[in-house]
């Protein structure tokens, strides 16, 4: 066999026991220089670093069932809300808090001081019910009725609780915010149910434990030291991940009920909350986490309390993760983090992440945006993308389409990789399943060749960007770089696709992009905008992404108006800057701005919410404009954001639909603004945003500065130092395009999904 050092490299392959010859052959064929196990598989005993670089998954806070038995009171906890119940006209109200929740995943913690760590709230009046007015009774868990997946037996320590409100207000609505013990690890539960592990003898339901408890933390450190000594063949410890899982809660039938990839709900514990009170000077309440049942989802503008909790959790997680990483380094190994699962508190763009000294980050690549989320992480030596499909039986089965998913995954991710290359790519799951689909393996081999060429053809040079700097403005800013409008990682949701297309497009466009928070602008005023040419505010009204009430801050309004007036560009998508202020007469102490979009004067349009129907509006669409030059056919913007009308006769209406403005352009003093109703992902919409940014920045004459493609389905990247261009077809069908710029022009014809290099000086395809 060829020595691993002579292989092509940049590939991590999942392997398993029982297919030794197949593993050896495929590693050689694909040029894999690293191998890994996955959740549910083990590395063959013969694999060592002479064969390939060895990754091994490591779970600091689960998988040790012996310790789980010894630390029963030190489980991961999570705040949950009961279903809402309406009180009867007379008599008490009893609420089974686990109604609707998965009895195999959670158990109410009735051993804690429930008067302190539980809350009963009258949701009608907004009042917290005094603990003396209600009582808690622990009751047995109810059996799971009609489960959707195969669950198997309930964990031995499953249970429920009934809260009785003795004298509720008649017909008021009540909820119970309760402290729940997690009796089954979220990731292992997901994999267990997805793969029908209940049918496999010996599979256990793993219980997670919390490093906030000193005894458990000492055990976790000792266990890692022992494991490192016992596994000298492992080169890279792939932490999957560290301590706290994103919010993932199932319903009573074993289906997903609440998923928030950014959720901090499972990072709570009594020791942590007590430490928080000492450090920040105030006590947390259950409602700080339950948040009326919204659980501080990232679409909510984060409260000051929740920001404090994120900061506190990130700081303590970074300190502990850093200790484990130091142990790995002391043994001469590398530390890699999986960006997912138990990643809460490991914010890779947060202030504490660099202190951990992580060598690498690997994450699942579900879109161009999630690819950039990984590849742009600062302070690590290398990044790796785990590509789809995952080698699980939900795809690798009769009737499944792993080849189609591989093509879609590559076309999607390639746009981001071209702009900000991942250092490595890999896959996960059961290799034995993938081997049953030889055409899939053939395609992976082709994808690998193209991926490697993006590193090798230009000697590591990155493609040139257009001379326009873009800032995406929302409540989260840098902390959630490339992470806006996501619920469950890269999954499609009706309410978000209209806006997710903005960062999906930006992830593959030739711009320098940064993410900026409202606070950054408010506190820094114009200084925050000094290095920016175009600001984008995209989102639905009253969300953290559009801004909501934050636009009542005059400092924010003033900074943006000054920025545009002095020549900057502003692009609003959906319901940008939407906030109706405080209703009331300005003479009576209210703020009656008379508009929904706070910056309607800048945008030249506003939203009609039936308050100004008596006003007549005369929209006259223009037939041609730089922004819509490549819009062939209808503008498919996504979900309807509501009626939008012009507020200035100088506003150029680019697209009208059913009497509403869907795209417009407007001059504001020396600057320019653009309004778009939405931007669901498509190559045409990506081109529309590309042109909108260039126009808003007064940079139309720079359109070909980094080469341009006549066909939106075909993109091009320009490498000036190498005098090379890379052209790539984003469509699943053949496409042709004229590539122009830098004094040259060439016609390219590409097969479905194909990428080709061009020697620009010679005008030849390579």
Located regions from the model:
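Catalytic domains of carbohydrate-active enzymes, especially glycoside hydrolases
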Residues: 18-51, 223-240, 360-361, 412-422, ...
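A short, well-structured beta->alpha microelement
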Residues: 12-24, 38-40, 337-346, 503-528
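Extracellular ligand-binding/catalytic regions of CAZymes and related secreted enzymes
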Residues: 248-251, 432-464, 507, 594-613, ...
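Polysaccharide-binding and catalytic clefts of secreted carbohydrate-active enzymes
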Residues: 75-355, 373
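The substrate-binding groove and active-site-proximal loops of carbohydrate-active enzymes
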Residues: 9-17, 32-36, 196-218, 300-318, ...
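Hydrophobic targeting/anchoring helices
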Residues: 65, 224-225, 238-242, 246-250, ...
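A glycine-rich, often tryptophan-bearing local segment used as a flexible ligand/cofactor-contacting loop or short
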Residues: 547-631
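Noncatalytic N-terminal accessory/assembly modules of large enzymes
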Residues: 3-62, 66-94, 102
